Amino acid sequence: MKAIKAKSPHAALPVGARLVCADNTGARELQIIAVKGYKGVRRRLPNAGIGDMVVCSVKEGTPDMRKEVVNAVIVRQRKEYRRPDGTRVKFEDNAAVIVTPDGAPRGSEIRGPVAKEAAERWPRIGSIASIIV
């Protein structure tokens, strides 16, 4: 895992946000229940942005995946963020990829585009991504 190069708004996805699962593990919808490494302020909901690892509950998917608690990395977010060259990037949906605790993807393919920041921070996600934006 490497440092992220863009100013990602970490207020994009608070705890409780629902995400599309962008891989082929059998999960379809995830809900954020915690953000790994978040050091916050009292009574403030932990927030996550692109490239952050989150702990999620599988809300929709195959019967063996449902109700499972998994680690995931956020690869797309609807809230726009700014890159160092001045461009602003935003996606159509909020999406994550289910990973193992050390950051290896559990699925073998990723549907849809992946943000460049997430692919740089998690090289194993970048290696199986079909489109990197």
UniProtKB/Swiss-Prot annotation:
GO biological process, one term: translation
Entry keywords, A to Z: Ribonucleoprotein, Ribosomal protein, RNA-binding, rRNA-binding
Listed Gene3D superfamilies: Ribosomal protein L14
Annotated PROSITE patterns: RIBOSOMAL_L14
Coiled coil (residue ranges): none
InterPro entries attached to this UniProt entry: Ribosomal_uL14, Ribosomal_uL14_arc, Ribosomal_uL14_CS, Ribosomal_uL14_sf
Record-level Gene Ontology MF annotations: large ribosomal subunit rRNA binding; structural constituent of ribosome
Alphabetized PANTHER family for the sequence: 50S/60S RIBOSOMAL PROTEIN L14/L23 (PTHR11761), LARGE RIBOSOMAL SUBUNIT PROTEIN UL14 (PTHR11761:SF8)
NCBIfam families hit by this protein: PRK08571.1, uL14_arch
Family the UniProt entry places it in: Belongs to the universal ribosomal protein uL14 family.
Function noted in UniProt: Binds to 23S rRNA. Forms part of two intersubunit bridges in the 70S ribosome.
Protein name: Large ribosomal subunit protein uL14
Organism: Methanopyrus kandleri (strain AV19 / DSM 6324 / JCM 9639 / NBRC 100938)
Lineage: Archaea, Methanobacteriati, Methanobacteriota, Methanomada group, Methanopyri
